[in-house]
Amino acid sequence: MAISRNGTRINFREPTQRRRGWGGRLANLLLGLVALWLFGLLAFMTAIPEPSPKTDTTTPTDAIIVLTGGADRLAEGFRLLDQGMAKRLLISGVAPGVTLEQLIDRLGDQKGTVPNAAELACCVTLGYAAESTAGNATESAQWLQRNGATSVRLVTANYHMLRSLLEFRRTLPGIAVVPNPVFPTEVRDPYWFLKPHTVLLIVNEYHKYLFALGRALPGELQRWSSWWPASKG
């Protein structure tokens, strides 16, 4: 750098030097974003429910909601209903045309542990409208309102529970939600992180959770902003 006679500063740095400066900043930014992504992923993995004696398995609720996606979820929902944990069960996200009998047939070895379709027909509703977790929450909210329910036991896979709770608590603010995670075979293995398929499953779920969190954030900010002036007064 030099100063001309009139006092104006003139930058004699080469263009390549300036480009290197911007390149370094960009590299630092990318490294920071990667570090933030990894930190978030580790936090997400740590928050995924694990089998624990502290899990609430005894509180009865007005209804049970099972999110489709695996035989373990269905079997758990039917078992809870049979044990009297609730009087009604909604299976949300059923493919169009699929019947209760067909869902029971998909239980495989677990089929013998649940009542037959005729016994379940009185208390089980199949929801065909939902195509996503957000859709599950919307479909469930409408069904719960029709049935006058104020509490629900939510059954889904443990790795899916964080996003499900986020969507349900955002969509059903007046409903008490009791999480009831099930543990699919692929995540029961203590060395699941060595299996590419399971790692991809968790990473994809992490990305979906971030997207759901981004969708929920404006509503949370609005709620906080409406609460803040009142709390100050």
Model-predicted regions and their roles:
Residues 2-26, 109, 121-124, 143-144, ...:
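Membrane-proximal intrinsically disordered regions of secretory-pathway and membrane-system proteins
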Residues 12-55:
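N-terminal type II signal-anchor transmembrane helix
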Residues 27, 72, 204-207:
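Residue-level micro-sites within transmembrane alpha helices that shape
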Residues 44, 159, 168, 206-209:
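Aromatic side chains
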Residues 61, 219-233:
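Short linear elements at protein peripheries
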Residues 195-225:
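A transmembrane-helix-recognition feature enriched in membrane-embedded lipid enzymes
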